Swiss-Prot record:
Composition-biased stretches (Low complexity): 86-107
Region of interest (Disordered), residue spans: 77-130
InterPro entries from the UniProt entry: FAM20, FAM20_C
Protein name: Extracellular serine/threonine protein CG31145
Coiled coil: none
Cofactor(s) the record lists: Mn(2+)
Highest taxon listed in the record's lineage: Eukaryota
Localisation per UniProt entry: Golgi apparatus membrane; Secreted
Length: 528
C-alpha cells in the first residue's frame, strides 16, 4: 500500500489498465474453454457474396423458413457446443410438405411423432397437401435460374468410359465386376438401363467366399471379401437390429456404422438418378465356414464364444474393436452389407478432396461454415467450385445426405483420369439412417447457404412429393429385392417423405429471398 501511495497518478492508471487487460484476457480464455458463446457472438465476418442468404424477412411465412431456422440455430450461436445440432423434430406427415417456414423447420404437419411424444386432440383442420405449384411454375421459366440451375450432366455427349480413357479391354474371362468397372463413364458409374448392375449384385450374394481380410485403417471393423475370379467386396457386418437408433449422447464422429444404411443408400442414389454409388447388397453368412475358416491370422486372434454361446469377433480398429463391442452371430449366422470394389488398376486412381462443408470433428469447435453466413461466397471463388459442375454436384450430395441423415461427409473422391469435370463418388454411408425422428438441417447447409439446386434434382423431388408414388414407396419396392429385406425400419421410410418436403420448402424460401433483380453480386450483411 505504501508503494501505491508513492506512485504518481499516471503510473497507477497504467498498472490499473494492465490489470484490467489481464483480467479480460482470462475471462476470454474461460469463455472459449467453457463454451459460453459470448466471445464470438459479434465476430461474424462480412465477406462478399454472389447470392443473398437474406434477413429475417421470409416473404409471407411469418419470419420463419428454413434459412431463418438454420441461421438461428447456427450462425447466431457460433460458439455453441457441437452437440447442440440444428434440428427439426419429426412430426411431418409423409405426404404433405410444410406450408410455412415454422412448420417445415419443426417438421410438423400432422404426422407421426417420435417415441415418447404425447399426442393431443386438435380441432384444427388438417393441412392440405402442398403440391408446390410455385416451384413447378418456376421450372418452366428461367426467371430463377440463379437458384434452380439447369446443369444436369448430358450422358449422351462427351462421356467416355474408363476402358476408352485407359485403352484397356476386358480380359477373356473377365468377371461381371471387371466389365462393370471398365464401363464406368465420365458422368456416372453406370447407365440407367445397365444390366451389369444386377449381375454384380447377384455375384456378391451367390458366389462362394474364398478369403477374408480385415481392411486396414478406418474407425470401425470392415472386411475385404474375396470371391473367385478376382472379385472383391467390402463387408460391413451387422451390429444392431433395424430399429436401434443412434445413441443420443454420441457425436456424429463416434456413431456406430450400420450395414443396412449402406444398402439403403445405394438404392436411394439409384432412385434419385445420381448413379454415383457402387452396387451394395445384403447377405447372411455362416461365421464359422465363411469367415473363421477363411480369415487371416490377425483376425482369427479376435474370435471368441460369448456367454450366450454365440460366435463373436472384433478385429482391430480405432473405435469399437474390443470384446465389449464385438460382432456376434446368432449363434453363428451374421448379416452384412457387401459393396462392390471400385477399379484398382493404376490409371484408375482416384483423387481425394476435402469437402468444403466438412464438420470440425471436435466436441466444441465449429467449422467455418457454421459461423460464417457468407461462407458459400468463399467456396464459389475456389477451384473447382468456381466453374463447371462440381458445386452443383455438392448440392446433390447435400440433398442425398440430408435424406439419409448422414452427417459424416468429410471427404469425397473423383476419378483422376477425368480431371475436374466428373462426378464425385458417393461412398461410405454407414452413419446414415440412424435417427428417423430427427431431421438434421445442418446437413442441408450447402443448399441453404448457396441457395442453389439442380433443376433435374428439383424435378425428382417434386415427383416424389406429388406422386403417384412417394419416395418411401419407391424405396420400399426397391429394397424388397434385397436378400436381407426389410432393409429399413418403417420410420426411416416415412422420414424420407418428410425430408423431401423440407428440401422443397427450403428452395421455396430461397426463391423468396433471392428475387431475380437482387442477383447483382453486391455485398449484403446476412448475419444480422
Amino acid at each position: 500500500m505504501a508503494v501505491l501511495r508513492t506512485m504518481k497518478l499516471k503510473e497507477r492508471l497504467v498498472i490499473s489498465l494492465g490489470a484490467t487487460l489481464v483480467l479480460l484476457t482470462l475471462l476470454l480464455i474461460v469463455d472459449v474453454q467453457m463454451d459460453f458463446g459470448v466471445a464470438n457472438r459479434h465476430l461474424l465476418q462480412q465477406q462478399h457474396q454472389k447470392i443473398r442468404l437474406g434477413n429475417d424477412y421470409d416473404g409471407g411465412t411469418g419470419g420463419g423458413g428454413m434459412l431463418h431456422e438454420f441461421k438461428r440455430k447456427f450462425l447466431q450461436k457460433s460458439n455453441a457446443s457441437g452437440s447442440k445440432e440444428a434440428s427439426t423434430q419429426a412430426g411431418a406427415s409423409q405426404s404433405g410438405g410444410a406450408t410455412s417456414g415454422q412448420d417445415a423447420a419443426a417438421g410438423a404437419s400432422g404426422g407421426a411423432a417420435g417415441p415418447g411424444t404425447s399426442r393431443s386432440t386438435s380441432t384444427r383442420k388438417p393441412t392440405p397437401h402442398d403440391r408446390y405449384a410455385d416451384l413447378q411454375k418456376h421450372l418452366l421459366s428461367d426467371e430463377y435460374s440463379h437458384v434452380i440451375v439447369d446443369n444436369a450432366p448430358d450422358v449422351s455427349r462427351d462421356n467416355p468410359t474408363l476402358a476408352e480413357m485407359l485403352h484397356r479391354k476386358a480380359s477373356a474371362n473377365a468377371s461381371n465386376l471387371e466389365r462393370f468397372q471398365l464401363r464406368i463413364t465420365k458422368k456416372e458409374l453406370y447407365g440407367e438401363q445397365d444390366t451389369l448392375v444386377d449381375a454384380v449384385l447377384r455375384d456378391m450374394i451367390k458366389l462362394p467366399i474364398q478369403h477374408v481380410v480385415q481392411k486396414e485403417g478406418g474407425t470401425q471393423l470392415k472386411l475385404i471379401i474375396e470371391y473367385p475370379n478376382d472379385i472383391k467386396a467390402l463387408m460391413k457386418p451387422m451390429r444392431f437390429p433395424r430399429e436401434q437408433q443412434t445413441l443420443p449422447n454420441h457425436f456424429y464422429f463416434t456413431d456406430y456404422e450400420r450395414h443396412n444404411a449402406e444398402i439403403a443408400a445405394f438404392h436411394l442414389d439409384r432412385i434419385l438418378g445420381f448413379r454415383r454409388a457402387m452396387p451394395v447388397a445384403g447377405r447372411t453368412l455362416n461365421i464359422t465356414t465363411e469367415i473363421y475358416q477363411l480369415a487371416e491370422e490377425n483376425l482369427l486372434k479376435t474370435f471368441f464364444v460369448s456367454p450366450s454361446l454365440n460366435l463373436c469377433f472384433h478385429g482391430k480398429c480405432s473405435y469399437y474393436c474390443d470384446t465389449s463391442h464385438a460382432i456376434c452371430g446368432n449363434p453363428d449366422m451374421l448379416e452384412g452389407s457387401f459393396a462392390a470394389f471400385l477399379p484398382n488398376f493404376e490409371s484408375g486412381n482416384r483423387k481425394l478432396w476435402r469437402h468444403p462443408w466438412r464438420r470440425s470433428y471436435h466436441k466444441r469447435k465449429k467449422a467455418q461454415w457454421e459461423t460464417d453466413a457468407n461462407y458459400c461466397a468463399l467456396v464459389r471463388d475456389i477451384p473447382p467450385y468456381d466453374d463447371g459442375r462440381r458445386l452443383y454436384d455438392l448440392m446433390d450430395m447435400a440433398v442425398f445426405d440430408f435424406l439419409t441423415g448422414n452427417m459424416d461427409r468429410h471427404h469425397y473422391e473423383t476419378f483422376k483420369v477425368y480431371g475436374n469435370e466428373t462426378f464425385p463418388l458417393h461412398l461410405d454411408h454407414g452413419r446414415g439412417f440412424g435417427r428417423p425422428f430427427h431431421d438434421e438441417l445442418s446437413i442441408l447447409a450447402p443448399v441453404l447457404q448457396c441457395c442453389l439446386i439442380r433443376k433435374s434434382t428439383l424435378v425428382k423431388l417434386l415427383d416424389f412429393h406429388n406422386g403417384p408414388k412417394p419416395l418411401s414407396q419407391l424405396m420400399s419396392e426397391s429394397l424388397s429385392q434385397d436378400p436381407v429385406s426389410p432393409v429399413l425400419w418403417q420410420p426411416h421410410l416415412e422420414a424420407l417423405d418428410r425430408r423431401t418436403g423440407i428440401i422443397l420448402q427450403s428452395i421455396r424460401d430461397c426463391i423468396k429471398r433471392n428475387p431475380p433483380g437482387d442477383v447483382d453480386g453486391s455485398e449484403t450483411d446476412v448475419s444480422s
